[in-house]
Amino acid sequence: MPSTKNANGEGHFPSRIKQFFRINSGSKDHKDRDAHTTSSSHGGAPRADAKTPSGFRQSRFFSVGRLRSTTVVSEGNPLDESMSPTAHANPYFAHQGQPGLRHHNDGSVPPSPPDTPSLKVDGPEGSQQPTAATKEELARKLRRVASAPNAQGLFSKGQGNGDRPATAELSKEPLEESKDSNTVGFAEQKPNNDSSTSLAAPDADGLGALPPPIRQSPLAFRRTYSSNSIKVRNVEVGPQSFDKIKLIGKGDVGKVYLVKEKKSGRLYAMKVLSKKEMIKRNKIKRALAEQEILATSNHPFIVTLYHSFQSEDYLYLCMEYCSGGEFFRALQTRPGKCIPEDDARFYAAEVTAALEYLHLMGFIYRDLKPENILLHQSGHIMLSDFDLSKQSDPGGKPTMIIGKNGTSTSSLPTIDTKSCIANFRTNSFVGTEEYIAPEVIKGSGHTSAVDWWTLGILIYEMLYGTTPFKGKNRNATFANILREDIPFPDHAGAPQISNLCKSLIRKLLIKDENRRLGARAGASDIKTHPFFRTTQWALIRHMKPPIVPNQGRGIDTLNFRNVKESESVDISGSRQMGLKGEPLESGMVTPGENAVDPFEEFNSVTLHHDGDEEYHSDAYEKR
């Protein structure tokens, strides 16, 4: 189809699709070698790993929640993990400026970014070829999620000055169409003849009836998830602005408290991280990485950050309080510690949507498990705990795939997220014992495919109340992961699972990561599996969740387990630091000419989200 260009020689594309892909990214080349990663735990110092007769590389494991262990040990020579591709256009970086520290690097000098092939853009054939009007219709079908990465210029390959690239606006190059394919992508205008194979279009046949919508209460989601919905300001609060109510969680370097803001009376979950412990355990970069992900993410299934600031001894992340507690605890209260297949499909869909967004942002989550999934008071899920997440190397451009029907109302566009992660591999040995993928155990490096493996384990656990490869000890569990087939109990009283569900689990738990579902086109592979045929992806957050938490009073923490606190953090007595770590009352502190503040890159900001004022107003009138 001939392209239409404006006076500047730029083609046109529906503006809503541009908004869908609004992010930019960058990579900064420099040399630094990360220290040995340490074990994540509730306590205890890390120790080096050692070989065992079983041949597995070992680390010290610590009990987490249900006696499942979390492993965080560096394996081999870690590859480069470059600076996150968060947007220069993102309000957070527009306010703060680009960070000077590459938070995620655990390796040596970064390798050259892989070449990105030209993306061939094809369209439906014959009479199904979309017109300009149907392109606008296609744009309307897209569920607009703010901060979703941009298709053009997502990564930059030649930043000679070491700075991040400028804003990666969706380029106005012409949208190409042909008569021999059912895919739509973005044409890369290069003089060479490179082209990539078009992705097969998902089959949209058989979409079921729309599930009944949830009756929206005043406390349901009201956030505006658009690219302009976040306003970033200098931090407006400090430790003295909050009253501590109760400890609701703890880890090896910090604790999570339910707090109430004195001025507004709003409840928040405040993550308090000890600077001393982070230095001791070499986890500073993880805290900086988590802040960056939280501050730049804007998605209904990812926990919201409102304030970040620091005192002389602590870092503070003030986040949305999810009164439903851990999804793990909700599962434990169900008969058989499991839920029906239809309910598991709903939560698997929400997790898939969250992972799709993270992959578009260039992040590999790497720690999916029920303990890291929180239930919003509306019953929808929210992913939390991003300290183990990893940033990918510069990758390619996402390709949009439309259904065979072209403009059919039942044919929703999907996006190839795999290209955003490129061929990035990391050698870090991280994860939860029963959720670790085979390639992580082998120490051969892993990619974003580990997130789809953990999704398969999660679905299995939701259905059967246990993980599929659990052994009597850690080595037995690892051996089962590497060698055993997936067991589907069929004895009397065992859950009755459909063949489509078993098919999805089998494909997600393929031991060869290159053949695993999601290895070809990322989340689109999962979303187009027949198991999700009746799932209305664009309407998930407006549907009624299977589990709606009992609220009680907001401060009752009914859905959280009791956590014993050995040493309480005095929030109100902490001495607040300035925007870049200097004590407020003392001006710029220079402890030494060559001294470097390791927490200088932790930014103190307040984030305002459109719709929250009305939401909080209703919430606290009902308390």
From Swiss-Prot:
Q: Where is the composition biased (Low complexity)?
A: 199-209
Keywords annotated in UniProt? ATP-binding, Conidiation, Kinase, Nucleotide-binding, Serine/threonine-protein kinase, Sporulation, Transferase
Task: Give the catalysed reaction(s), semicolon-separated.
Answer: L-seryl-[protein] + ATP = O-phospho-L-seryl-[protein] + ADP + H(+); L-threonyl-[protein] + ATP = O-phospho-L-threonyl-[protein] + ADP + H(+)
Q: Which GO terms describe its cellular component?
A: cytoplasm; nucleus; plasma membrane
Xref: SMART domains: S_TKc
Q: Where is the composition biased (Basic and acidic residues)?
A: 27-36, 170-180
Which Pfam family is an annotated match for this chain, by its short name? Pkinase
Keyword ATP-binding carried by entry: yes
GO BP annotations, alphabetical order: conidium formation; phospholipid translocation; sporulation resulting in formation of a cellular spore
User: Record's InterPro entries?
Assistant: Kinase-like_dom_sf (IPR011009), Prot_kinase_dom (IPR000719), Ser/Thr_kinase_AS (IPR008271)
Q: Does the keyword Nucleotide-binding apply?
A: yes
Q: Which residues form the Protein kinase domain?
A: 242-532
Binding residues for ATP: 248-256, 271
Record GO terms (molecular function): ATP binding; protein serine kinase activity; protein serine/threonine kinase activity
> Region Disordered: which residues?
1-215, 569-596
Lineage top rank: taxon? Eukaryota
Residue numbers annotated as active site: 367 (proton acceptor)
EC number(s) from the headed UniProt entry: 2.7.11.1
Q: Which family does it belong to?
A: Belongs to the protein kinase superfamily. Ser/Thr protein kinase family. KIN82 subfamily.
Annotated function: Controls entry of the cell into the asexual developmental program. Required to repress entry into the conidiation program.
Q: Could you tell me what this protein is called?
A: Serine/threonine-protein kinase nrc-2
Q: Which organism is it from?
A: Neurospora crassa (strain ATCC 24698 / 74-OR23-1A / CBS 708.71 / DSM 1257 / FGSC 987)
Lineage, opening ranks: Eukaryota, Fungi, Dikarya, Ascomycota, Pezizomycotina
Q: Which gene encodes it?
A: nrc-2
